[in-house]
From Swiss-Prot:
Gene3D superfamilies: Phosphoenolpyruvate/pyruvate domain. GO terms for molecular function: magnesium ion binding; phosphoenolpyruvate carboxylase activity. It catalyses: oxaloacetate + phosphate = phosphoenolpyruvate + hydrogencarbonate. HAMAP family: PEPcase_type1. Keywords: Carbon dioxide fixation, Lyase, Magnesium. This is Phosphoenolpyruvate carboxylase. Forms oxaloacetate, a four-carbon dicarboxylic acid source for the tricarboxylic acid cycle. InterPro entries: PEP_COase, PEP_COase_bac/pln-type, PEP_COase_Lys_AS, PEPCASE_His_AS, Pyrv/PenolPyrv_kinase-like_dom. Signal peptide: none annotated. Its EC number is 4.1.1.31. PROSITE patterns: PEPCASE_1 (PS00781), PEPCASE_2 (PS00393). Belongs to the PEPCase type 1 family. One of its GO terms (cellular component) is cytosol.
Length: 923
C-alpha cells in the first residue's frame, strides 16, 4: 500500500502560476496584435529586466535607464500594460485564495479563526451563562458603513470587466471537456481585448450621484442576499446554544452609508442629494421585494383542493385578483398578488420613478411601513407550516422575510455628518436672527452650554417662514429638514445618526442638537415630558488631543440635564466615533493607535460610571496609515468592554470592492465582523489580566516617544511640507477624479489641513508608506535602551496582547510594501539638495531602525514571516511595481521641468492607478 502523497507548497501554488501565465499570455497577445511588435517588445524587455532586478542580477537603476527619455506615445501603452498585468494577477490571486479555502474545507481542517464556525467552537468551550449572554447581546449591532472616501481608483467599467473575466476563469477551472475549455478561453480573450480597449482612468470627476449609485450597486451584487442569510444563520446558531435567552430580537447585521449624507468638506451634498440618496436606496429594496414576490408566486402554486390555508391567508387571497376566477383555487398566488399590489402602491408613493416590477390597481392601499408588509409574509409562512409545508416556507419566502426584517423600506441607514466649525457658524447666525444672542461665537464655553440647553427646552423655533439667512446657514437647515422628510417617509432607521466631526466640546454636541430641533428631528418635549430625538448625536474625536479629552467631553455632556434626557430617551445608548486617519496624520502610527486605545478605555469607564450603553464607531480607512488591516484582528485588539455586542465601522474605497463585490468574499468578511464582535464581547480576549495597568503605562511611554519622533520630522523640520509636495505625486492625486470631494479642506500648505487620503496615497505611491510606521522604531529603540529585560517585556506583550501584536503585524504589512531604493528616486525630484538629504536621511534611518526593532521583538528576521502567502504575493508584484514607479518618477520629472502636455499628465495618472492596483490599496 503506497503512502498518500503530501502536497508541497509548489503543488499548492501551481494553479496560481498557471493562471497568471495564461492571463499574461492573453494580454501579451492582445498588446502585440493591437499596439504592434515594437511596443510589445519594449514591454517584454522591461518586464524581463524587472524580474532580473528582483533576482538581484542587475542594479536598481536598470529599469530606470531603459525608460529614461522614452517617447510618451510608447510610455502610455507600457504603463497600461503593467497596470493590466497586475490587475489580472490580482484576479488570479483571488481565485487561488478561494481554491485553497475549498481544499482546506474538503480536507476537514479546523475552521479559520475569523469564521463563525471557529467562534462557535470557542463559545461552546467557554460554557457561558445564558443570562449574561442575553445582557451583553441585548443591543447587538454590527454595522459596516459604506463611505464615499475616494480611494477606489478603478472605474466601474474596468471593475465590471474584471468581474466577468473572474467568472470565466472560474468556469475554465471547472471545465473538463477540452472543447468547453477552448470556448471559455476564447471568451476570456475577447474580454481582455475589451479591457485593453477601455480607458483606465476617468475623464471627469465622479458626481455624488455617481457615488450613491456605486455604493448601492454592492447590494445588487452581494449584500442584499448575503446579509439577511448571515443574520438568520447567526440568530439560529446562538438561540440553539442558549434556548432560554431570546437572543438577537433584531438582526445583528444592519448596514449603513455616508454617501449623500456626509457633507464635511463636500459642498456637493445638498438637501436634494439627501433625499435622492434615501430614495435611491429605498428603490433598491422595493424593486427587489417586488421581483421576489413574482418569483415566489411561481413556486407557491398550492391548490385549495389539496391544501388548507389559515383564515388570514384566505382573507389575503380574497383581496387578490379582481377576477375571482384568476388562480381561483390557488390561494397563495392570490394572496401574493394582493401583497404585490399593496407594495406597488407603496413604491408609487415613496419613490420618484416608476418600478418595472410594480402592478398598479386603483384604490390600492400602500403599506404604512415594513412591519405591515412583513406581517403579511409571516401570515403566509405560518399557513404553510400549519399545513405541514414548512419546507416551502424555508426557501424564497424565508429569504424574503429575513431581507425585509433587515432592510425595511430604507435598505440602509444614511448617516449625516458635518464639521463642528460649520455648526458653530450656523447656530450663531440662527441665534442672532431670532434675537436670542447677537454674538454667540464670543461666548465662553459654559455660557454657550447654558444658552443651548435652554433653547433645547423650548418649542419655539428660531426661524420663521421669512427668515433671511446666509447661503451656508440656509443650506444646512435645508439639509436637516430634508433628513426629517426622509425619516417621515421611510422611518427613523433611514437616518439613524448625526456625526459631529472635529468635536472638541459639549457645545459642539449641543449645537448639532439645536440644528436637529430646528429641522424637526428633535422634540423638546415641552411643556410636558422629556426631550427625545430620532437621530443619535455622535461626537467624532479625531486628533490625538481630542481623543485624549473625548471621555471628559462625553462625561461633561451627560451632566447637562437636557442632553442626559436625550440619551435616556434613546435607551441610555450613546454612540461615539473615533477617527483613525486624522489622529495618525497628527501624531504618527504608534501614537495614534495608542491614543485610540486609551480613548476607548476612558470612554468605557465613563459609560460604567454614568450607566450608559456605549457604542463605538470606528472610522477606519483601507490602509494601515488610516486604521486599516484585518477587521477581525482589529476587533479583538479592542480593550475589554469596548465592544459589548455593538460595533460600527466604515468601509471605504478600494476596500469595499475587495470585500463585497463577490458573494463568497462578502460572506467571509461579514462573518469575520460578527465573529470578532461575539468573541470580543463574550470572551476574555485581551489576555493581560493583572498585567494590564503596567502594560498601559508602558504604552503611554512608547506613544509619547513615538509622537515626539514623528513630530520632529513632520511638524518641526523646516521645509518638510515642501519636501512632501516635491517628492510625491500629492499634487496630482486631486486630478485622479476618484471622488466628488476636494483633496483639501481649505487651500493651504499645512499638513493638518490636507485630507488624510491624499496624504497617505502620496506616500504610498512613492513607496515610503510613512504614515504606517514612522516614529515607531525610534520609540521602541529609545524605550528599550539596550536593556535585554525591557526587550523581553515587549516580546512578552507581542505574544500575549492582541493590541500590541496587531500594531506590529500591520506595521510589518505596510513596511513590506515600502521600497526605499524606489523612494530615493522620488527624493531626487526635490530641488533643494540639502533639504532632500536631510529629510530622506531621517526617513531612511528610521526605516532601518523600525525594521531592527520589529525583528528583535517578534523574533522574525523577515517581515511577514508569519504570513507567507501575503509575503509571497508582495514579492511576486515586484516586477509590475518597478516599471510603474520608475515611469512615474520619469514623468513627474518631465512635468516639473515644464512639459505639461496632456499626455504626460495622463501618463502620471495612469501610473497612479496602476500602483494603487498593484499595492491593493491606495489611500
Amino acid at each position: 500500500m503506497t503512502e498518500p502523497r503530501i502536497e508541497t507548497e509548489q503543488d499548492a501554488t501551481r494553479p496560481l502560476r498557471d493562471d497568471i501565465r495564461f492571463l499574461g499570455g492573453v494580454l501579451g497577445d492582445t498588446i502585440r496584435d493591437h499596439e504592434g511588435p515594437e511596443v510589445f517588445d519594449l514591454i517584454e524587455r522591461v518586464r524581463i529586466e524587472a524580474f532580473r532586478v528582483r533576482r538581484e542580477e542587475v542594479g536598481r537603476s536598470a529599469v530606470a535607464e531603459m525608460l529614461r527619455g522614452v517617447d510618451i506615445a510608447v510610455a502610455l501603452p507600457l504603463i497600461r500594460a503593467f497596470s493590466y498585468f497586475v490587475l489580472l494577477a490580482n484576479l488570479a490571486e483571488d481565485i487561488q485564495r478561494d481554491r485553497r479555502r475549498a481544499v482546506h474545507v474538503a480536507a476537514g481542517e479546523p475552521p479559520q479563526d475569523s469564521s463563525l464556525a471557529a467562534t462557535y467552537r470557542k463559545l461552546d468551550a467557554a460554557a457561558l451563562d445564558a443570562a449574561a449572554v442575553a445582557d451583553l447581546l441585548s443591543d447587538a449591532l454590527v454595522s459596516p458603513v459604506i463611505t464615499a472616501h475616494p480611494t477606489e481608483t478603478r472605474r466601474r467599467t474596468v471593475f465590471d470587466a474584471q468581474t466577468r473575466i473572474t467568472e470565466l476563469m472560474r468556469a475554465r477551472q471547472r471545465a473538463t471537456d477540452p472543447a468547453e475549455r477552448a470556448a471559455l478561453e476564447s471568451r476570456i480573450r475577447r474580454q481582455v481585448l475589451s479591457l485593453w480597449r477601455t480607458a483606465l482612468i476617468r475623464l471627469a470627476r465622479l458626481r455624488i450621484q455617481d457615488e450613491i449609485a456605486v455604493g448601492l450597486r454592492y447590494y445588487e451584487l452581494t449584500l442584499f442576499d448575503v446579509i439577511p442569510a448571515i443574520n438568520a444563520e447567526v440568530r439560529a446558531a446562538l438561540r440553539a446554544r442558549w434556548p432560554g435567552a431570546d437572543l438577537l430580537a433584531r438582526p445583528i447585521l444592519r448596514p449603513g452609508s455616508w454617501i449623500g449624507g456626509d457633507r464635511d468638506g463636500n459642498p456637493y451634498v445638498t438637501a436634494e442629494v439627501v433625499r435622492h440618496a434615501a430614495t435611491q436606496a429605498a428603490g433598491v429594496a422595493l424593486r427587489r421585494y417586488l421581483a421576489e414576490l413574482v418569483e415566489l408566486a411561481k413556486t407557491l402554486s398550492l391548490s385549495a383542493r389539496l391544501v388548507p390555508v389559515t383564515p388570514r391567508v384566505a382573507e389575503l387571497a380574497a383581496a387578490g385578483y379582481p377576477d375571482p376566477a384568476t388562480h381561483g383555487d390557488e390561494p397563495y398566488r392570490r394572496a401574493l398578488h394582493h401583497i404585490r399590489v399593496r407594495l406597488s402602491a407603496t413604491a408609487d408613493r415613496v419613490l420618484d420613478a416608476p418600478v418595472p416590477e410594480a402592478v398598479a390597481e386603483p384604490d390600492a392601499q400602500p403599506y404604512a411601513g415594513p412591519r405591515e408588509f412583513l406581517d403579511d409574509l409571516d401570515a403566509i409562512d405560518a399557513s404553510l407550516r400549519a399545513s405541514g409545508d414548512g419546507l416551502l416556507a424555508d426557501d424564497r419566502l424565508a429569504a424574503l422575510r429575513h431581507a425585509v426584517e433587515t432592510f425595511g423600506f430604507h435598505l440602509q441607514g444614511l448617516d449625516m455628518r458635518q464639521n463642528s466649525e460649520v455648526h458653530e457658524q450656523v447656530v450663531a447666525e440662527l441665534l442672532a436672527w431670532a434675537g436670542v444672542h447677537p454674538a454667540y461665537g464670543d461666548l465662553p464655553e459654559d455660557a454657550r452650554v447654558e444658552l443651548l440647553a435652554a433653547e433645547l427646552r423650548t418649542r419655539r423655533p428660531l426661524l420663521g417662514p421669512h427668515a433671511r439667512l446666509s447661503e451656508q446657514a440656509a443650506k444646512e437647515v435645508g439639509i436637516v429638514r430634508a433628513a426629517k422628510q426622509v425619516v417621515d417617509t421611510f422611518g427613523p432607521e433611514a437616518v439613524p445618526n448625526y456625526i459631529i466631526s472635529m468635536c472638541t466640546s459639549v457645545s459642539d454636541m449641543l449645537e448639532a442638537a439645536l440644528l436637529l430641533k430646528e429641522g424637526g428631528l428633535l422634540d423638546p418635549g415641552a411643556p410636558e415630558g422629556s426631550p427625545s430625538c430620532t437621530v443619535n448625536i455622535v461626537p467624532l474625536f479625531e486628533t490625538i488631543e481630542d481623543l485624549g479629552a473625548g471621555a471628559a467631553t462625553l462625561a461633561a455632556a451627560l451632566e447637562v440635564p437636557v442632553y442626559r434626557e436625550l440619551v435616556a430617551a434613546a435607551g441610555m445608548r450613546q454612540e461615539v466615533m473615533l477617527g483613525y486617519s486624522d489622529s495618525n496624520k497628527d501624531g504618527g502610527y504608534l501614537a495614534a493607535n495608542w491614543a485610540l486605545y486609551r480613548a476607548e478605555l476612558d470612554l468605557v469607564e465613563v459609560a460604567r460610571k454614568t450607566g450608559i450603553r456605549l457604542r463605538l464607531f470606528h472610522g477606519r480607512g483601507g490602509t494601515v496609515g488610516r486604521g486599516g488591516g484585518r477587521s477581525y484582528d482589529a476587533i479583538l485588539a479592542q480593550p475589554a468592554g469596548a465592544v459589548r455586542g455593538a460595533l460600527r465601522l466604515t468601509e471605504q474605497g478600494e476596500v469595499i470592492a475587495a470585500k463585497y463585490a463577490e458573494p463568497g468574499a462578502a460572506h467571509r468578511n461579514l462573518e469575520s465582523l460578527i465573529a470578532g464582535t461575539l468573541e470580543s464581547t463574550l470572551l476574555d480576549v485581551e489576555g493581560l489580566g493583572a498585567d494590564a495597568e503596567p502594560a498601559y503605562e508602558l504604552m503611554d511611554e512608547l506613544a509619547a516617544l513615538a509622537r515626539a519622533a514623528y513630530a520632529r520630522l513632520v511638524h518641526e523640520t523646516p521645509g518638510f511640507v515642501e519636501y512632501f509636495r516635491q517628492s510625491t505625486p500629492v499634487a496630482e492625486v486631486g486630478d485622479l477624479n476618484i471622488g466628488s470631494r476636494p483633496a483639501s479642506r481649505k487651500p493651504t500648505n499645512s499638513v493638518s489641513d490636507l485630507r488624510a487620503i491624499p496624504w497617505v496615497m502620496a506616500w504610498s505611491q512613492a513607496r515610503v508608506m510613512l504614515p504606517g510606521w514612522y516614529g515607531t522604531g525610534a520609540a521602541l529603540e529609545e524605550w528599550v535602551g539596550g536593556d535585554p529585560g525591557r526587550l523581553a517585556r515587549l516580546t512578552d506583550l507581542y505574544r500575549r496582547w492582541p493590541f500590541f501584536r496587531t500594531v506590529l503585524s500591520n506595521l510589518a504589512q505596510v513596511m513590506a510594501k515600502s521600497d526605499l531604493d524606489i523612494a530615493a528616486r522620488y527624493a531626487e525630484l526635490v530641488d533643494d539638495a540639502a533639504l532632500r538629504d536631510q529629510i530622506f536621511g531621517m526617513i531612511r534611518e528610521e526605516h532601518a531602525r523600525t525594521l531592527r526593532m520589529h525583528a528583535a521583538i517578534t523574533g522574525h528576521d523577515q517581515l511577514l514571516a508569519d504570513n507567507r502567502s501575503l509575503a509571497e504575493s508582495i514579492h511576486n508584484r515586484f516586477p509590475y511595481l518597478e516599471p510603474l514607479n520608475q515611469m512615474q518618477v520619469e514623468l513627474l520629472r518631465r512635468l516639473r521641468s515644464g512639459d505639461d502636455s496632456e499626455l504626460v499628465k495622463r501618463g502620471i495618472l495612469l501610473t497612479m492607478n496602476g500602483l494603487a492596483t498593484a499595492l491593493r490599496n491606495s489611500g
